[in-house]
């Protein structure tokens, strides 16, 4: 018997709660969640953040000034049924009628357990943030309680349609919004190219150690290159140690640590090139944000890349692991900085009319209202809350 863990529907519209399964640690899902919740509240749509404990040893974004955060003790990643029962009081305290669990078995398990209370009237919106087996397994397992599935790229939406053919009407695409320059950029051709990476400093998924190979390759080429590395993660010490031991005559590197999301716009605006080595993505937020500020993206051929980048016109796409091609593209751009300016302004134009905040927020609220008009979530009592 589950009691006292239901959510009272608010007056005046849906009340949404987003889960941060590993707290406010560095990552695109975190920055998207923090920014969207803030905008929703500014537009009088009630939103709360359920902030779980962070990964051990990871830096977190500062959130002392946030009134929309409720802290939940315990890491949701890999949480078992006992931990999930412990999360219930916090989830109940947000009094939401729409939940967005994001990427964790523990967060989906908690809302599934909540739904077993017959007095609860909740809906679940499942965001597929990455073209990854984990997401597809997660959403397939919890399909019984999900009202809407939102893919962040066409690749993801196509995959969802294949694995969930009975839910075609409940699958939609919503691409992240970004800030876009209102004017063209005029880079200083006399300065070295500034190449920026913004994201998790992690080998898993991000393949961040490819950065070392890129440095080595550029060190053997003509030109001068300045790198800015913004982020935190388990491979940060390895990267900094490598650069401390290895001197490059034409490659300089700044490690900026975890940069607040609101400062990233200026960082992209002061950079010439953005890079992404990822093994898989959904629709890289750093790629979109950098393009909006006129950075030329050089990224791997993952979900979202070909959807937003025309190779050679609004950026460059290389195969995963093909660092040599990435280095050659950077060297060629250094030798022809007029082309950097041309592609930079093409990037700004390509995202200007497709990633507005107001349009995104209106579409998101529309999805919430469609969910509220449908049936409430109810987990099958014969199915385990989390897989055995």
What are these regions (language model features)?
Residues 30-35, 202-217, 234-237, 324:
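A conserved mid-protein helix/loop that constitutes part of the nucleotide-sugar donor-binding site
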Residues 101-108:
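Short His-centered aromatic/hydrophobic patch
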Residues 146-183:
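Donor nucleotide-sugar binding/catalytic pocket of nucleotide-sugar-dependent glycosyltransferases
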Residues 187-206, 212-215, 228:
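Conserved donor-binding/catalytic core segment of Leloir-type glycosyltransferases
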Residues 240-259:
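Nucleotide-activated donor-binding/catalytic signature segment of Leloir-type glycosyltransferases, i.e.
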Residues 279:
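Aromatic "clamp/platform" in nucleotide-sugar-dependent glycosyltransferases that forms part
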Residues 296-299:
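Short hydrophobic beta-strand element within catalytic cores of glycosyltransferases
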């Amino acid at each position: 018997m589950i009691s006292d863990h239901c959510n009272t529907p608010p007056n005046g519209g849906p009340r949404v709660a987003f889960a941060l399964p590993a707290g406010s640690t560095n990552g695109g899902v975190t920055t998207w969640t923090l920014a969207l919740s803030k905008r929703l509240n500014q537009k009088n749509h009630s939103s709360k953040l359920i902030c779980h404990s962070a990964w051990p040893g990871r830096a977190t974004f500062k959130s002392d000034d946030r009134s929309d955060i409720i802290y939940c003790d315990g890491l949701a990643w890999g949480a078992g049924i006992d931990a999930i029962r412990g999360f219930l009081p916090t989830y109940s305290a947000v009094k939401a009628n729409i939940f967005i669990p994001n990427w964790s078995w523990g967060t989906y398990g908690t809302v599934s357990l909540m739904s077993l209370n017959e007095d609860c009237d909740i809906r679940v919106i499942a965001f597929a943030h990455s073209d990854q087996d984990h997401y597809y397994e997660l959403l397939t397992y919890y399909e019984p309680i999900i009202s809407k599935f939102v893919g962040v790229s066409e690749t993801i939406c196509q995959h969802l349609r294949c694995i969930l053919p009975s839910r075609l009407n409940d699958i939609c695409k919503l691409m992240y919004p970004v800030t876009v320059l209102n004017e063209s950029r005029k880079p200083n051709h006399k300065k070295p190219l500034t190449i920026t990476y913004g994201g998790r400093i992690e080998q898993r998924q991000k393949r961040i150690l490819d950065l070392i190979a890129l440095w080595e390759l550029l060190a053997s080429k003509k030109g001068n290159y300045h790198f800015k590395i913004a982020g935190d993660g388990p491979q940060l010490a390895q990267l900094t140690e490598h650069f401390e031991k290895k001197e490059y005559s034409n490659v300089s590197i700044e490690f900026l640590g975890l940069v607040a999301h609101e400062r990233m716009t200026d960082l992209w605006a002061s950079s010439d090139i953005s890079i992404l080595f990822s093994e898989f993505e959904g629709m890289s937020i750093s790629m979109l944000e950098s393009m909006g500020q006129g950075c030329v993206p050089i990224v791997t051929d993952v979900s979202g890349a070909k959807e937003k980048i025309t190779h050679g016109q609004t950026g460059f796409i290389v195969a995963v692991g093909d660092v040599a091609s990435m280095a050659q593209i950077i060297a060629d751009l250094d030798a022809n900085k007029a082309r950097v300016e041309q592609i930079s302004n093409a990037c700004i134009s390509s995202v200007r009319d497709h990633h507005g905040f107001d349009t995104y927020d209106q579409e998101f609220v529309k999805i919430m209202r469609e969910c509220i008009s449908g049936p409430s979530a109810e987990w099958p009592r014969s199915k385990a809350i989390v897989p055995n």
